Amino acid sequence: MGTRFVNTRRMFLGQVVMLVAAVARRAWAQAYDSVRYQPLVRPVVVPLDDLTMPAKAFPFTADGMTLASAAEPNQPVRLNGMVVRLSKGDNTPERFKAVCLKCPHEGCDVEFIGDPGRVPAEVTGAIGKVSKPLYICPCHNSTFKIDDGSKLFGPAPRGLWRFHVTAVSETAVEIGEVEEDALLFT
């Protein structure tokens, strides 16, 4: 056995170990819903006047940085998102949810469907009657809940990546963090 074969085998085994560790980390995070967030380059501020009613959505763009463990580390990344008011009442961060509009299946831009009558027949056939707005990927009909971006239907391997609403003032909703995996896979 030559040194070249041993080095090649060690490199291969090292790559296999890294792949298994990455898959295990992701499975662990999904199983225990322990989502880790990273700060955005600067918080996104959405006027509260644009989110007065439940199920009212507002699009935004956020700037982040890829993680040190990403294929291209510490690079600027622009993320399109949508913030939604979930219910009436006092203006606390829990009343608002924000998601990344990039489908985790193949990276297509997800659409906010505010009118349940516009939901494709394939989706209603799979999940039943729709009474609330949804996020739908136009590429393969992956469908996600408005409440938290969790997956309802389709080939997407998981729900939408989430942003963290960090504060709500008298005039604005502030989005200051994004789910760590969004910075690895975008």
Language-model-derived ranges and their functions:
Residues 18, 109, 114, 143-145:
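Secreted/processed peptides and extracellular or luminal domains of membrane proteins
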Residues 115-118, 122-135, 145-176:
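Polybasic, low-complexity binding patches
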